[in-house]
Amino acid sequence: MSSRSRSTFLAISFFVLIDWVSKLAVLLYRGNLPDARPILYQYSWGKLIFCICPTFNEGAAFGIFSKYKYFLFAIRIAIILGILAFLFLRKKRTSPSIRFSLILLCSGAIGNVGDILFYRHVVDFISIGFKRWYFPTFNFADIFISLGTFIFVYKLYFPTKQKIK
């Protein structure tokens, strides 16, 4: 295994581990509470609100397409396999930022697919809000997917200029 492949594998493993350990910690903590209350932790900073409140999502982003579980699962697996094939089988060097964005995308997808395999749904637990408005609950895998997508799209639309030698 080349050093590039090894570092890619380790990076994906690291991000997936962050996602799975955080979800497991939240679920174990929730299971130890006598009343299984929905909010495990809440912190307010002025008008900003941060909550740890586990919820379960059977669809895609924000629960959409929850009626198409098997189709979504197949799409997720195809995306993971496509990204892994690109990362590990491509001989030509890829820019580090594109490579990192694909590592984040793949890690997030693997994290959520792991949830589906182990729990039959995706475990979301991070909730943020401002005054009375709350963003839909999410997890670290969702953060990785969003950040990876942002970096990927940014690098496609605003590529760095290469000096011609």
Curated annotation (Swiss-Prot):
Residues annotated as the enzyme's active site: D124, D142
Subcellular location as annotated: Cell inner membrane
Entry's transmembrane regions: 9-29, 69-89, 98-118, 133-153
Any one Pfam family match given in the protein's UniProt record, by short name: Peptidase_A8
PANTHER family: LIPOPROTEIN SIGNAL PEPTIDASE
Membrane topology, record value: Multi-pass membrane protein
Pathway per the UniProt entry: Protein modification; lipoprotein biosynthesis (signal peptide cleavage)
EC number(s) per entry: 3.4.23.36
Catalytic activity: Release of signal peptides from bacterial membrane prolipoproteins. Hydrolyzes -Xaa-Yaa-Zaa-|-(S,diacylglyceryl)Cys-, in which Xaa is hydrophobic (preferably Leu), and Yaa (Ala or Ser) and Zaa (Gly or Ala) have small, neutral side chains
Name of the protein this chain belongs to: Lipoprotein signal peptidase
Disulfide bonds: none
Function: This protein specifically catalyzes the removal of signal peptides from prolipoproteins.
Gene Ontology MF, one: aspartic-type endopeptidase activity
Record HAMAP family: LspA
Stated family: Belongs to the peptidase A8 family.
